[in-house]
Amino acid sequence: MKDDEIKSMLGRCKTIAVVGISPKEDRPSYTVASYLKSKGYTIIPVRPDGETILGEKVYHSLQEIPPEVNIDIVDIFRRSEDVPPVVEEAIHRGAKVVWMQEGVIHPEAGASAERAGLQVVMDRCIKKEHQRLM
């Protein structure tokens, strides 16, 4: 994806579900989500356990997020082999973008998301891209 497309996406998207976020402050998923929240994005933590992270209610899956909440970006902090079911949930949930963080690469899942009409960013850090482009 080209820089101008990412910049436009980051400018118009406001709600980011962070799948695989850690409650540990030294983990990249936590620091990225904290940064995005500090920049005005609404963060929705998604992980199998926990109650709150960064002052936000933790949901155990994308499907658990109330349907009236529009998810713009699904930011994935999971191993590459764990990506396909997350992408399927993102598609069914009506997300606009699937963002796979640095080191998270799954071309087949990315292609599936694109076929469903989602934009896909793969193997890039959303925080670094925001700092660079915004």
Language-model segment annotations:
Residues 1-12:
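Short N-terminal or domain-adjacent regulatory/targeting segments
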Residues 17-19:
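Conserved beta-strand elements of the Class I
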Residues 39-41, 93-98, 116-118:
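A short helix->loop->beta-strand "cap" motif at the edges of active sites that frequently abuts
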Residues 62-104:
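Mid-chain, well-packed structural core segment of small domains
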Residues 102-130:
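Rossmann-fold NAD(P)-binding glycine/threonine-rich loop
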